[in-house]
Amino acid sequence: LLFNEMAPRPHNSGHQTINASVTSQFEQQVRICAGLPIGDTTLKYDVRLENILGDLWFSNNSIGPHEPNWEELTGGVKILKLYGKNEPRVGRKMGHLITLIRER
């Protein structure tokens, strides 16, 4: 068994639990710290999470970064979460998009 990363906290690889699971990874951490039983981990939706990298701010061949057209990128149906970072850089995680595909 090989590990490439250990995170003793909620992690960005599980952010889809906020919208798609009965109990989010954030609530699970609070429950553990409070000595409560673990919550239901059942997925309510089939879900896809896509990372948003700083590359997107530089994608139109303009000089310098520009704010992406979020409405065009999300189509109004994806859940957009930006992390509030001030400076986009190529390869930097700036946020994520969650798509709830269908209810289970």
Spans of model-derived segments:
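Glycine-rich active-site loop/lid that clamps phosphate-bearing ligands
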Residues: L43-D46, I52-P88
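Active-site "cap" helix and flanking loop/linker of ATP-utilizing ligase/carboxylase catalytic domains
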Residues: A7-S59
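Protein kinase-like catalytic core scaffold
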Residues: L1-E5
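Generic C-terminus detector
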Residues: K78-R104
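Short, low-complexity, polar/charged sequence segments that are solvent-exposed and flexible
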Residues: V22-F26, N69-E72, G76-L80, T99-R102
